[in-house]
Amino acid sequence: QEWKERMRASITDTGNALTDSEIIGLSRELDMEELLQYRNCVGRRTREIVTNLTPDDMKRRVSPVQLEQILKEGGVTKQEESLWLLDYWGQKDVAGLLLMPPTRHVILHLNDCCRWKEWIRTRKRKI
């Protein structure tokens, strides 16, 4: 809650159910300096956790209780565009979850980035 206020974020979930205009609105309202500080803190804490994982931990799947906790705490919403993440995460082991962001996750967003870039270019030509 403290970080949410510091960043001036209006959401606590992953943002998967946001529309393009909601993403733009969120981007405008966020305090980018605080967002960078948050990212750095998350990175440090993640490194601490990962450093202490054992080989057996890497094979462990996320439990239904943990998935329910994510929903309860607002990490995902009950919207279909957000809720599917719980099913996805529930099918992965810890190793798969750790590999997803630096590998597949970035690729998922490339199409959106290209589409936004083209929209911005088209808009600039009209001005």
Segments and roles (model prediction):
Residues R39-V42:
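Alpha-helical segment that forms one wall of the substrate-binding/catalytic cleft
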Residues E22:
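A conserved mid-domain beta-alpha-beta active-site/ligand-binding segment of alpha/beta enzyme cores
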Residues Q1-L18, R44-T51, P64-I127:
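Short, contiguous alpha-helical
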Residues D57-V65:
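Domain-scale activation on soluble regions of proteins
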Residues L26-Q37:
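A short, structured beta-strand-centered segment in the mid-to-C-terminal lobe
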